[in-house]
């Protein structure tokens, strides 16, 4: 691996170990195409994985592992991922995007044929390292959120508002395949509803959510939920 690509790997390692003020706002994974100074770049990702974790839903170690396994299964080339958390608690901890990353697409055969042979090895190594560090970043971030989760029957939690907030971001993303992976027990506890009270009329609550504009449109994204119904 040449010095330039070695520096990229070092940068990735540094990013995994240190907090970044801009983390989550931009792509936190440096580009192998840019590092190689090619005249072309990787196309936009055709897949989006948006992981949204409810900090008011503590999970067992087995379910935490299931979250990580599902993330790993969904990540691959040409994939953009977002790791975010939410929970309105006593310290005003609302929705926060912790990391956004892109695993780039490999070069097409036509592109490879126009790249000097001595540059291909370094690029291929960089792409392997990029995928490894992207998965490691997603896993570590998700694990930190899961391990810090706390739950209590009266803990404030605006699940519908969190979903409403991320919906436009997901809907407007140009990826052809979009997935929202929600980790939550689904117990809304806000000015809108208090599931712990046990006195809810589902049809009435659905109508109220519609009236208050709390129903989210994810633009055709698939939505998967892990943890539904788990009590704190």
Q: Language-model features: where?
A:
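Bacterial N-terminal signal peptides that target proteins for export
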Residues: 1-9
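Bacterial N-terminal signal peptides
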Residues: 9-17
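Sec/Tat signal peptide C-region and signal peptidase I cleavage site
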Residues: 18-23
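Von Willebrand factor
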Residues: 24, 28-32, 45-176, 179-181, 188
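VWA/integrin I-like adhesion module and closely mimicked acidic/polar interface patches used
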Residues: 27, 187-232
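Acidic/histidine-rich, surface-exposed loop or edge segments in extracytoplasmic proteins
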Residues: 43-57, 141-150, 224-229
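N-terminal post-signal-peptidase region of extra-cytosolic proteins
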Residues: 63-71, 163-165, 203-211
């Amino acid at each position: 691996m040449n010095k330039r690509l070695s520096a990229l790997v070092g940068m990735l390692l540094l990013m995994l170990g240190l907090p970044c003020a801009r983390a989550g706002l931009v792509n936190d994974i440096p580009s192998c195409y840019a590092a190689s100074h090619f005249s072309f770049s990787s196309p936009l990702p055709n897949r989006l994985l948006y992981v949204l974790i409810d900090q008011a839903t503590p999970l067992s170690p087995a379910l935490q592992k299931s979250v990580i396994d599902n993330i790993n299964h969904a990540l691959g080339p040409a994939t953009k991922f977002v790791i975010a958390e939410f929970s309105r608690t006593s310290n005003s901890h609302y929705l926060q995007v912790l990391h956004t990353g892109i695993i780039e697409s490999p070069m097409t055969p036509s592109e490879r044929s126009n790249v000097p042979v001595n540059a291909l090895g370094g690029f291929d190594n960089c792409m392997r390292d990029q995928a490894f560090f992207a998965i490691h970043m997603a896993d570590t971030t998700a694990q930190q959120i899961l391990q810090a989760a706390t739950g209590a029957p009266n803990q404030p939690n605006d699940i519908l508002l969190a979903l409403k907030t991320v919906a436009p971001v997901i809907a407007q993303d140009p990826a052809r395949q979009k997935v929202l992976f929600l980790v939550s027990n689904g117990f809304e506890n806000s000015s809108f509803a208090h599931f712990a009270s046990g006195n809810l009329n589902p049809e009435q609550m659905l109508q109220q959510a519609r009236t208050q504009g709390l129903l989210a449109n994810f633009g055709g994204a698939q939505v998967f939920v892990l943890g539904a119904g788990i009590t704190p």
